[in-house]
Each structure stands twice: as structure tokens, then as C-alpha cells.
């Protein structure tokens, strides 16, 4: 199976770039790729299950949550970035786990 790695470092509220990143993630999964998603810096906010989206805005967290449950998707939130933003196990999406930058670099070598 072909592998694809993507790093999300922007918050879900950062304009159209995060939506396009999710479009890319969805396309890779639909084409049968095994996808590794690394959430870094403000990107860890995609993993917050209790995040509220303002009325009238697209809920990218729910969209990411749905994509991250795909059997070929491995989603990892940077533990250090998560701690800096108050993200703990109790507020983490069930389909996302904590990990370190080493996992990102390993994923790049196999993608």
C-alpha cells in the first residue's frame, strides 16, 4: 500500500488552507493510500473533541474527526504542542493519539 504523510500546523480557524489540507487527506484516503497525519503547533487543535465552531463557519474539527477514523489513517498529535495548548487525554479525539516529532520523521522516510 502506498503511504502518504501530511503535517497540519495551522489551527482549524486559519482560513482556507486547513480546509484544503483536509481535501488532500480525503483524496489520499479515497485513492487507497495509508495516511499518516501529524498535528503540530496549532494543528493540534484539530484533535480537541470539545472545540466549538462559531455559527456559520465550517466545522473542520468534525470533518477531521470523521476522516481520522478511516482504517488507513493514523493521526498523531504532537505531545509537546498539545501540552502547551492545554490539550489532555480527556479532551483528545478517540481517533488521535499523542506522539513526538520522531514519528513524523520516521513517517517521512517511509512515504
Task: Tell where the protein language model's regions lie, with residue ranges.
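C-terminal structural segments of small proteins and small subunits
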Residues: 85-111
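Short, glycine-rich nucleotide/cofactor-binding loops
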Residues: 4-19, 47-52
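A glycine-rich helix N-cap at a beta->alpha junction
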Residues: 53-84
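A structural signal for isolated positions on well-ordered beta-strands in alpha/beta enzyme cores
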Residues: 5, 36-38, 76
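Short, active-site-adjacent cap segments at secondary-structure transitions
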Residues: 44-47, 83-85
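Histidine-anchored nucleotide/phosphate-binding helix
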Residues: 17-32, 37
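Short glycine-enriched, charge-decorated loop/helix-capping segments at active-site entrances
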Residues: 50-55, 91-94
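Cofactor-binding loop segments of dinucleotide-utilizing enzymes, especially the Rossmann-like FAD-
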Residues: 9, 40-42, 80
Amino acid at each position: 500500500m502506498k503511504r502518504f504523510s501530511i503535517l497540519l500546523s495551522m489551527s482549524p480557524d486559519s482560513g482556507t488552507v486547513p480546509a484544503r489540507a483536509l481535501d488532500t487527506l480525503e483524496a489520499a484516503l479515497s485513492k487507497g493510500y495509508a495516511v499518516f497525519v501529524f498535528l503540530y503547533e496549532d494543528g493540534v487543535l484539530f484533535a480537541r473533541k470539545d472545540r466549538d465552531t462559531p455559527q456559520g463557519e465550517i466545522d473542520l474539527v468534525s470533518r477531521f474527526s470523521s476522516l481520522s477514523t478511516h482504517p488507513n489513517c493514523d493521526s498523531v498529535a504532537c505531545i509537546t504542542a498539545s501540552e502547551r495548548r492545554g490539550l489532555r487525554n480527556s479532551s483528545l479525539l478517540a481517533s488521535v493519539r499523542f506522539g513526538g516529532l520522531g514519528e513524523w520523521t520516521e513517517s517521512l522516510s517511509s512515504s
